[in-house]
């Protein structure tokens, strides 16, 4: 679309309306099976942002059908822009597997997503940086500032095409490497807001915000999650790599956006946790969801499970025609060329942008608790070092609440000033993929469309028409009555049984007393003993001043003082590493910014943050 055509459109509303008609998505396989009353209104296609370099970004816009009850009550006039990460991973992941209104069936037909975020707002998915997904260019972005400028140019062109959206409250949302994009894009909008856009808030899920802080979460998180065995022969190598990462961070001459030494921690953990006794496809833990497994060294690159179906669907000729592509393009989830060129060397990390942004808008950081690569512990470590208000770092006067959805506790929420942290239970790197209906509550939380209880918050349950209700507690009265009926009658034991029971309790009490005495004077050690040599570790998760660490402490051979302690030693817990509950004491030096953690070698090897 030429600049002259766009200029003409700004002068003639009829022209704008006509141009919108060209972007309507009129049909998709299976769309006719969805009732018209709940069928989303869709526009899609390319917008030119740089004619000289043949740069056009692809978008897919979803609107909820008119007269939706939710839009008239809880939510009014709101627009979400959703961005996936990478760098170089398509936001069609979000559209077709996460927050969009459609899913793809095994028949390669669309069907409704019961957890669509269009129940709470209109939503716009953008493939960026240029070259990602269906977008294309002759000149790839290399820096975050450059990507932000291109995104701002896209928004200006988009608002010319859809001027009615300029009055909507804007929220930027996304996951993973979007933890870099979103703060940069918000800053660009604020500094160049000639359109008077009302940017209300940011939502970042399992975000990659500060590579240095977050890389140091991998070892403690992996141990706490249980997929890394502290008894593993490879544990020494993992800890050695952790130490190298810490040294690289502390090195004032190392200005790398992301330190190679820190990237290697992650790879060493995947190698150390490999189980070669299992079938090949189950040997490696899934880096995006440690409940699942994959081939080694893919370790999650074959996830999510719905990706092959979505890939086939988006590469159908009929689908690409319906999406108004200017020319056919083979869709890949992640583009290797984009990742290869996007190597920020002159950008500060997005962590450094957050304090100023928090002065102007609400920011929600959410994390699925089963992710490894951008795990919840790493987000908590980022928050501890983040200036939330001038002079205040981390949560100091926050309130933690349980999050209730449809009568179930689905997470924890902590808020102070404009910052909210949400830990989502039983979910992966892609929270909306696992829990679509629950995830919609993330937007309810940032917009305060909730009900509060004494210790909990409750987010609404929506139906397909947008009607909603708040369900604080599930009523399972009938089920409880059935369970009560099925209980066997109580059995009354003889006097001999009770005498024996008292004797057993007495023995247990003696063993516990012995256990207490043997451990009363024992010291905690921040690291697993790697050898009998008395060598103090340079990398630690406790400050030495806090625990009185010296070279002699905790390194002498420990002899069991009781039968119960012997059992603990046999199980591998005697005198071993004590996990640390937070990352406050990790020594950090000022660091630079970040690119993606994993190199994509080619279009076929799609591996990295999403």
UniProtKB/Swiss-Prot annotation:
Glycosylated residues in this chain: 68, 192, 196, 418, 426
Protein name according to UniProt: Pheromone-processing carboxypeptidase KEX1
GO cellular component, as recorded: membrane; trans-Golgi network
Broad class of the protein's primary localization: Golgi
Alphabetized UniProt keyword annotations: Apoptosis, Carboxypeptidase, Glycoprotein, Golgi apparatus, Hydrolase, Membrane, Protease, Signal, Transmembrane, Transmembrane helix
Taxonomic source organism: Ogataea parapolymorpha (strain ATCC 26012 / BCRC 20466 / JCM 22074 / NRRL Y-7560 / DL-1)
Pfam families, per the entry: Peptidase_S10 (PF00450)
UniProt function note: Protease with a carboxypeptidase B-like function involved in the C-terminal processing of the lysine and arginine residues from protein precursors. Promotes cell fusion and is involved in the programmed cell death.
Domain of life: Eukaryota
UniProt-listed Enzyme Commission number(s): 3.4.16.6
Residues annotated as the enzyme's active site: 176, 371, 429
Catalytic reactions on record: Preferential release of a C-terminal arginine or lysine residue
């Amino acid at each position: 679309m030429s600049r002259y055509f766009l200029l003409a459109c700004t002068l003639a509303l009829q022209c704008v309306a006509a141009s919108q008609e060209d972007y309507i998505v009129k049909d998709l396989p299976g769309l006719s099976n969805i009732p018209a009353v709940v069928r989303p209104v869709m526009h899609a296609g390319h917008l030119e942002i740089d004619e000289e370099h043949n740069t056009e970004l692809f978008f897919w816009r979803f609107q909820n059908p008119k007269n939706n009850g939710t839009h008239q009550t809880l939510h009014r006039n709101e627009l979400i822009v959703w961005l996936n990460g990478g760098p170089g991973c398509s936001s069609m992941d979000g559209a077709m597997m996460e927050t969009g209104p459609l899913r793809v069936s095994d028949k390669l037909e669309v069907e409704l997503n019961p957890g669509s975020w269009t129940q709470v707002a209109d939503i716009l998915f953008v493939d960026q940086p240029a070259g990602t997904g269906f977008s294309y260019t002759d000149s790839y972005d290399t820096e975050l500032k450059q990507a932000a400028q291109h995104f701002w140019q896209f928004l200006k062109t988009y608002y010319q095409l859809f001027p009615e959206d300029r009055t909507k409250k804007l929220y930027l949302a996304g996951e993973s490497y979007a933890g870099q994009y979103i703060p940069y894009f918000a800053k660009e909008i604020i500094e160049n807001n000639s359109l008077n856009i009302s940017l209300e808030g940011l939502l970042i899920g399992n975000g990659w915000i500060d590579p240095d802080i977050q890389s140091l979460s991998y070892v403690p998180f992996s141990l706490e999650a249980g997929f890394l065995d502290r008894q593993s022969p490879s544990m020494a190598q993992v800890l050695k790599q952790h130490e190298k990462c810490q040294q690289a961070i502390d090195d004032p001459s190392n200005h790398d956006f992301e330190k190679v030494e820190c990237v290697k921690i992650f790879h060493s953990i995947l190698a150390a946790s490999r189980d070669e006794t299992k079938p090949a496809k189950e040997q490696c833990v899934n880096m995006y969801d440690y409940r699942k497994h994959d081939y080694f060294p893919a370790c999650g690159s074959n996830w999510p499970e719905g990706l092959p179906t979505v890939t086939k669907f988006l590469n159908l000729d009929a689908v690409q025609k319906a999406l108004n592509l200017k020319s056919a393009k083979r869709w890949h989830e992640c583009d290797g060329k984009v990742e290869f060129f996007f190597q920020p060397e002159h950008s500060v990390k997005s962590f450094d942008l957050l304090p100023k942004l928090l002065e102007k808008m609400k920011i929600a950081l959410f994390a699925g608790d089963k992710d490894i690569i951008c795990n919840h512990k790493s987000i908590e470590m980022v928050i501890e070092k983040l200036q939330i208000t001038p002079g205040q770092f981390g949560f100091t006067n926050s309130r933690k609440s349980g999050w209730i959805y449809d009568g179930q506790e689905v997470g924890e929420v902590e808020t102070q000033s404009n910052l909210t942290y949400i830990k989502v239970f039983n979910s992966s790197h892609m929270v909306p993929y696992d829990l679509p209906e629950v995830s919609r509550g993330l937007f309810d939380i940032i917009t305060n469309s909730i009900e509060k209880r004494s210790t909990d918050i409750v987010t609404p349950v929506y139906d397909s028409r947008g009607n909603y209700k708040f369900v604080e507690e599930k009523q399972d009265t009938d089920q409880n009555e059935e369970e009560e009926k099925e209980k066997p009658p109580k059995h009354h034991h003889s006097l001999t049984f009770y005498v024996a029971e008292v004797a057993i309790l007495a023995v247990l009490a003696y063993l516990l007393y012995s256990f207490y005495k043997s451990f009363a004077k024992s010291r905690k050690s921040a690291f697993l003993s790697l050898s009998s040599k008395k060598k103090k570790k340079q990398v630690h998760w406790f400050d030495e001043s806090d625990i009185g660490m010296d070279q002699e402490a905790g390194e002498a051979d420990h002899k069991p003082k009781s039968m119960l302690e012997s059992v603990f030693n046999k199980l591998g817990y005697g005198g071993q590493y004590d996990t640390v509950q937070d990352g406050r004491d990790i020594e950090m030096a000022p660091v630079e910014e970040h690119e993606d953690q994993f190199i994509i070698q080619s279009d076929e090897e799609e591996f990295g943050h999403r």
